């Protein structure tokens, strides 16, 4: 690739990019990664930066994906003590808003990027920054692997058992596709994933609202079961025992809170004013994640869902 300045002596204008003959590898690379950017173009950042809505799609998907497995794991951990799910619901929503508010404050104080590595390095020292950064890398690896594996489980649960041996291939393919999309750039990956993200939001809203609307008549039964469960639990385990059960379920569902930090880490790719854009994105993410996770737990109660382990115990 060669460049040529066709603007005379005016060196302020970005040079034109002239395509030279490309090898097969270069053409394949361009097909996978996209065309190169002209870094001298003064409008390049404006073109690739994200407004609040697009940032919510691109970065919010990290947090929202955890709602597909976090609430379920927490509910499973309750076992037969599903009456504690109402407290779990409140604790989950409160935790999401506390974490989101904390990262909003970090965004204000670190407007050029306030991830765990930067904050810990600046406030506590470089060693703590390395620990925080390493934890974040591990968290991202787990988030990707668990989210893709959970998606494969959900998809193959609708398919005949005969095709289950394709699950590993689909998981690996999903990771490869996501990696290639992100290598093309933040805005390109957001554009490609927007239909999937919006489909996730719309379907969850329909199912949660529909589940609540069609089972509102179950509310008196749920209230009675919760009161009865608390009375029996206090008599059987005491306050300390019930608190231990609740904490166990709460920690098992901690995956719900992964990905909230993505907005603070990705503030560099947001449209000016960055701080305001990042704060709006954080609000979108907090509300959508709290509503989705909380709505799923409410539907579990209304539908009187029993964890699988308890079903197996009942048949023994």
Model-derived features with residue positions:
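Helix-loop junctions at the membrane interface of multi-pass solute transporters
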Residues: 58-59, 72-77, 104-109, 119-122, ...
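Flexible hinge motifs at transmembrane-helix junctions and intramembrane kinks/re-entrant loops
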Residues: 2-4, 156-170, 188, 213-217
